[in-house]
Amino acid sequence: MVIRWRHVVGVLVACILGAFLVTWSGLISIKASTGHWRITDIVLHWVMRSSVRSAAIGTKVPAFTKGMLPMAAGHFEAGCAVCHGSPAMPRPDSVAKMLPPPPDLKDKIVTWSDAELFLIVQHGVRYTGMPAWPVADREDEAWAMVAFLRRYPELDGDQYRALTGFTAIASQGMDRLIATCNGCHAPDRLRPESLIPRLAGQSSTYLEQALIAYANETRRSGVMAVAIEKLTEAELKDLAHHFAGEGADPMPLLAGDLFERGQTLALKGDPSRGVPACLSCHDKAEANPSYPRLSGQPAAYLANQLRLFVEKKRGGGPFKEVMTRAAAKLEANDISALAAYFSARDIADQNAPN
């Protein structure tokens, strides 16, 4: 028999039609309860690992700092532990019936490189239930999570609770919400290297506008998106009022070249480069209550926020465009100097909370 093109085409059409009929018939089971065939499981994991490995090629890994850990740990407790469990609490039995089931990360993290972990955290994994980071343009937060995951396998329950600010309380009211916020934002948890802002000393206007901006996604943060996703606007306002009423402890003034450079920029700006003076708007008597108070904030937090403004990723309340323009000409050394200055600036120099 001579095989002609029409025979080949006929076989292909028959195969396609057969595949369609099998799929349409519903004979292929999609039950999670029965699991995958072993070969299916092997192929799916092979494809996933190969894809992540290739996508991670050329990814530049930033330096990790201790300041990354508390923010990422708090997010892990709020958004990840419900599936993966944690050193403080085992994962719920219900998620064990997912297909594939979320793994215990203590044993899995060591099998991935930093770049590969970033790809998984930032983009998620299809067909596994592993979501992408809640917002697409906050790679800095995803890298903080990678820094935390690197530390995760060595944490015991007490170390995990200390890092996350984990608090288990019975109340379901405002006390619970305040305790949850303080798990990250409590003043005694903040250090110069913290990426978490100090809330005490801010105006209720600024805090309310910031929280509503997070809720409306005009200020984008995967960490805050998860933290406030279940809160009503009334609860956001109550939280803003509460934290605005907390006093801010004075901070000692520090000397040094970086501090002095930051002080000059804050007081005078740099007119030759179009950089305005920060203190013409911030931290002065009768300042616009929508402007945040900068004195006493962790240096790492301030530097990160300024970088986000420079990169046009920051967002925020009604005056976000003002700050985007003000920060546009800042260079890396300017950001470091301003962060050092305002972090060390005496809070007593600024106006009392509204």
Question: Can you say where each PLM-predicted feature lies in the sequence?
Answer:
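Periplasmic c-type cytochrome electron-transfer domains
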Residues: 2-86, 92-95, 108-123, 128-183, ...
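Cys/His-rich metal-chelating microdomains
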Residues: 86-87, 187-188, 284
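Short, non-ligating residues that shape and space the ligands of small metal-coordination modules
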Residues: 89, 190-191, 287-288
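Short cysteine/histidine-rich zinc-coordinating motifs and their immediately flanking basic loops
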Residues: 92-98, 193-198, 290-296
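Extended intrinsically disordered, low-complexity coil regions enriched in Ser, Thr, Gly, Ala
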Residues: 93, 99, 203-225, 254, ...
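N-terminal targeting leaders
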Residues: 162-165, 258-259, 305
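Short, solvent-exposed interaction modules
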Residues: 178-183, 256-283, 287, 291
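C-terminal functional regions that serve as terminal interaction/effector modules
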Residues: 236, 276-285, 290-354
